[in-house]
């Protein structure tokens, strides 16, 4: 199995209730069930007030690297990426477990 973690940092001045952010969250929330390669899917807002913390996280799992690649290339995923690109930056980590 492959774990795919994504941590998002909202751009300066962008808040969680910004309509673009709300749309972006919903775009990713709705991926579960649309992309059959997803084996595990959870996402949520950070609770920590530490300055090093990121704002939003996605924790997902896939059977193998081919399934992860299918997910990454999927048009629904790419549409979500395009939304988030407008108001955030992010880091990822992919590892076997």
Tell what function each PLM region has:
Residues 1-55, 63-69, 96-97:
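Short S/T/G/P-rich N-terminal loop/turn motif that feeds into the first structured element of a domain
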Residues 62-93:
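C-terminal structural segments of small proteins and small subunits
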């Amino acid at each position: 199995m492959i774990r795919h973690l994504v941590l998002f940092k909202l751009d300066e001045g962008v808040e969680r209730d910004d309509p673009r952010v709300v749309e972006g969250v919903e775009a990713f929330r709705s991926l579960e069930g649309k992309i059959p390669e997803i084996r595990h899917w959870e996402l949520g807002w950070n609770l920590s007030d530490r300055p090093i913390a990121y704002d939003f996280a996605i924790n997902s799992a896939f059977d193998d690297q081919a399934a992860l690649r299918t997910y990454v290339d999927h048009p629904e995923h790419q549409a979500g990426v395009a939304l988030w690109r407008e108001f955030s930056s992010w880091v990822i980590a992919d590892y076997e477990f």
